[in-house]
Amino acid sequence: MAGIGFELKKLFRRKGLFASLRAYGYAGIICTGPMLLGVALQMGILLLCGWVGAERAQQDLLVCMITYTLLFSLTVTSFFSMPVTRYLADMLYEEREQAILPSFWGSSSLMLVLGCSLYGLFLLVSGATLLQGLLCLWLFAEMIVNWNGMSYLPAIKDYRGILCSFLAAIGLAFGLGLVLVVLLGFPVPEGMLFAVAMGYGLMMVWDVVLLYRYFPQSDESPWPFLKWVDEFLPLAFTGLCTNIGLFAHLVICWVGPVGVQVKGLFYGAPYYDVPALIAFLTILITSINFVVSVEVNFYPKYRDYYSLFNDGGVVGDIVTAEEEMLAVLNRELRFTALKQLFVTAAVLSLEGTLLDLLPLGFNDLMHGYFRTLCVGYGLYAVGNTILMILLYFTDYRGAVTAAAVFAVSASGFTALSMAFNTAFYGFGFLIGAALFYLVTLLRLDAFTANLPYRVLGQQPIVAETRAGRFTRLGLFLETKSAARAKHAAGEEREDE
């Protein structure tokens, strides 16, 4: 990702307002991808439904179905995304580009089988109609591929193509939704679900075409990436726990006093969900800043420091390089925190005026949730930036510990807040995010206090290869694929 930041930095150096807007647009899509699309579509759908006068029950059902699909797909992909990203980085470093496309389809197919099976079972008993269930499952499958694709797309550095796919998806979803619901009179849930699925589908096809233009096709096995899941299992749990901490408070509020049963097993908390969605957008600045500023300025010092260990640098040079690297890191993290603080303060100052202009029905309780969650998401954003730095230093144990603290504390304190007045519900996530920030900060400070020992003394003397369940699953799938290919080749020879 530091390489992506260097490329984006070139765009930021160009003068002019439009050049800066384009650079921030590219960075935003690279950093947030389908999640930003999901939030934008959610807000757009609410505005469109309000404009056409749709019933509140239909709006709530539509929002619930899209939100459930988003969160379920995020949960499935969050476990595999970091190991897959590590596999991609290793293949690029080893110049084995021919292994990348097979791993994309292998990881996508594995997540599709797992996710569609579980989500399909939920939809069967959820109370959704057959058409609604099929549309949700279709949208879920597209989101799985899109989420997985965002691990691969930054490597191609075709920012214009990625941005065009994003804008085309939004345009198609809104345009088709307008035609189906307003002009043709389709029911709101089914019509808008179909429109959103078509938008995500266009983005999926567009992004896959971009990948095929850049990476070579090959007949290599699609399953070696599973060895990386075993090898870097803490990365998998780091992604999963971070996802749980980020979204568990929404699910808990759905079944709490502010939650409502929309239909069957579809629950929602409109007074809480809408402020949470808008507050989530405030972390965009920190996400972009991490790629185009923190990594870009930190990475050269980081590379120089570790190259001294690899190339036989003297002790004096290593000490000097370490001091320079940590000074840059501290400066960039401080600037990141200040930028997020400024954005959060500005949003809190203006939210009363701006949100009342939108036809979202904000009341005093929703304004309170929004302010609380803005602070919580701001703390999460800075904590997540520090977490990424821990991963830079390969402190996987510290990263997974911090992520687990975030998941447990955000979920636990949110559940505990259900016993208090509804005005305090957002504070559970706020406390969890604050603990996440503190744990990551303290861990980074402790880890970098004795960095040479971490680099040299904690490395294993003998290299070990972990062959766990995922490795065995990969070998099993490779055996089955080889047997199937051999059988197909035998049938072809018989036909000849």
Describe these PLM feature segments.
Residues 195-199, 203-295:
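Transmembrane helical elements of multi-pass membrane transporters/channels
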Residues 92-104, 273-357:
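Specific pore-lining/lateral-gate transmembrane helices of multi-pass inner-membrane transport
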Residues 153-179, 390-412:
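Alpha-helical transmembrane segments of multi-pass membrane transporters/permeases
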Residues 63-89, 243, 247, 276-301:
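Small-residue-rich midsections of specific transmembrane alpha-helices
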Residues 165-212, 423-445:
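Hydrophobic alpha-helical transmembrane segments
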Residues 1-41, 60, 64, 226-235, ...:
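N-terminal membrane topogenesis motif
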Residues 67-72, 109-112, 121-153, 343-349, ...:
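Alpha-helical transmembrane segments of multi-pass membrane proteins
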Residues 20-36, 163, 221-248, 333-342, ...:
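Hydrophobic faces of transmembrane alpha-helices in multi-pass small-molecule transporters and flippases
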